Design a protein with these regions (language model features):
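C-terminal transmembrane helix and the adjacent membrane-cytosol boundary/short C-terminal tail
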Residues: 143, 189-199, 238-271
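Generic hydrophobic transmembrane alpha-helix motif, especially the helices
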Residues: 52, 56, 87, 96-97, ...
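Glycine-rich helix-loop "coupling/hinge" segments at transmembrane-helix boundaries
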Residues: 126-128, 140, 155-156, 205-247
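N-terminal signal-anchor/first transmembrane alpha helix
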Residues: 1-33, 109, 187
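Hydrophobic alpha-helical transmembrane segments of membrane transport/permease proteins
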Residues: 15, 21-58, 212-220
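Loop-to-helix entry region at the N-terminal start of transmembrane alpha-helices
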Residues: 64-77, 127-147, 239-245
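Transmembrane alpha-helix signature in integral membrane proteins
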Residues: 62-97
Length: 271
């Protein structure tokens, strides 16, 4: 409770993030219509009392699709962040602790990945794998783990210098136990803060791939795909792009600000 009282920004954006999560969890109860129900006679209707966000080219209720899009976007984003967190942290810890050729190989691969524009490389990988959300997650993860690996490596190198690590090695403590008991607890906070701050960015990248045709496929209710479908009718039915775009902006801002707030709470030295 003390944290919430002292950090109003953290409190505000925690509440907003919980609202977003609530919308995702209770989408079937909140949405007025089935997001996949097509009624061609009601296609491209402007916002009204029956359809507050209007309808798309197939007569599907846009509000329902935006609500269900929250679930799709949030779930896939959290999966993406979890994947790059685990892979990046694992490789970074291995590189930092063992050093030598292991460190050299992992860091050279990371440097090679960083030398390419991330989104361009992700598009290339997604193009080879084929368009769907799972492949989009794989594509972005393939180019995004490097940040976590470099951060984890630098923290392991710092922790390795402590005398208790040397004492554990001298006492014959197994490597896996040293990593789990002495190394990871000293770096997990910073890694979690980084992951929390990345949620908004990863959500935007997933939406970007879907917008470009390399992510979600029809009829999945996903914000990036909805923007892609709506751009054809931008002059005739601008609401097809306005509402999914607003949803993306709101969620990205909320989770970016929440990530900054978590950084301030867990690591006040960063303020």
């Amino acid at each position: 409770m003390k944290v919430f009282k002292e950090n109003k920004q953290f409190t505000l954006f925690s509440i907003l993030a919980l609202i977003v999560v609530g919308v995702a969890v209770f989408a079937p109860q909140i949405a007025p219509y089935d997001p996949l129900d097509a009624v061609m006679l009601e296609s491209l209707q402007a916002p009204s009392s029956a359809h507050p966000f209007g309808t798309d080219k197939l007569g599907r209720d846009l509000l329902s699709r935006v609500i269900f899009g929250t679930r799709t976007s949030l779930v896939m984003t959290l999966c993406l962040v979890a994947v790059i967190f685990v892979i990046g942290t694992f490789l970074g810890v291995i590189a930092g602790y063992f050093g030598g050729i292991v460190d050299g190989v992992i860091m050279r691969i990371a440097d090679m990945m960083i030398s390419f524009p991330g989104l361009v490389l992700a598009i290339a990988i997604a193009g080879m794998l084929g368009p769907n959300l799972v492949n989009a997650v794989i594509s972005i993860a393939a180019v995004s783990w490097t940040k976590y690996a470099r951060l984890a490596r630098s923290m392991v190198l710092r922790v390795k210098k402590n005398l208790y690590i040397e004492a554990a090695v001298v006492n014959g403590t197994k490597t896996w136990k040293i990593l789990l008991v002495h190394v990871l607890p000293n770096m997990v906070t910073q890694m979690v803060v980084t992951a929390a701050a990345d949620i908004g960015t990863m959500m935007l990248e997933l939406a970007s791939l879907s917008f470009l045709g390399f992510g979600a496929t029809a009829p999945t209710p996903e914000w990036g795909l909805m923007l892609n479908e709506g751009r054809t009718y931008m002059a005739k039915a601008p609401w097809l792009m306005i509402y999914p775009g607003i949803a993306i902006v709101i969620c990205v801002v909320v989770f970016n600000m929440l990530g900054d707030s978590i950084r301030d709470v867990l690591d006040p030295r960063q303020e």
